[in-house]
UniProtKB/Swiss-Prot annotation:
GO terms for cellular component: cytosol; small ribosomal subunit. It comes from the Bacteria. Residues 1-20 are annotated as: Disordered. Binds directly to 16S ribosomal RNA. It comes from Corynebacterium efficiens (strain DSM 44549 / YS-314 / AJ 12310 / JCM 11189 / NBRC 100395). HAMAP family: Ribosomal_bS20. Pfam families: Ribosomal_S20p. This is Small ribosomal subunit protein bS20. GO terms for molecular function: small ribosomal subunit rRNA binding; structural constituent of ribosome. One of its GO terms (biological process) is translation. Gene3D superfamilies: Ribosomal protein S20. Keywords: Ribonucleoprotein, Ribosomal protein, RNA-binding, rRNA-binding. Belongs to the bacterial ribosomal protein bS20 family.
Length: 87
């Protein structure tokens, strides 16, 4: 337990940020999971719409500072490759 007042405040702030980031990361992972489920189902239309949703979620997470932009770009690229393999 911190004794310094500023550190006590930082601990509170860090905990709030951790919970917020955790929720955003979880939402992004859920959208990516839905995309992979659509790919496994072989439904190209559903996969395309889910790809759009997952990409948007990743972009929003980057804007909020949860993911680094290069990390999100790599994830989006990986999703696009999986979609293109569906043919």
């Amino acid at each position: 337990m911190a004794n310094i007042k500023s550190q006590i405040k930082r601990n509170k702030t860090n905990e709030k940020a951790r919970l917020r980031n955790q929720a955003i990361r979880s939402a992004v992972r859920t959208e990516i999971r839905k995309f992979h489920a659509a790919i496994d189902g072989g439904d190209k239309a559903a996969a395309e719409s889910q790809l759009r949703v997952a990409s948007r979620a990743l972009d929003k997470a980057v804007t909020k500072g949860v993911f680094h932009r290069n990390n999100a770009a790599n994830k989006k690229s990986s999703l696009a490759r999986a979609f293109n393999k569906l043919g």
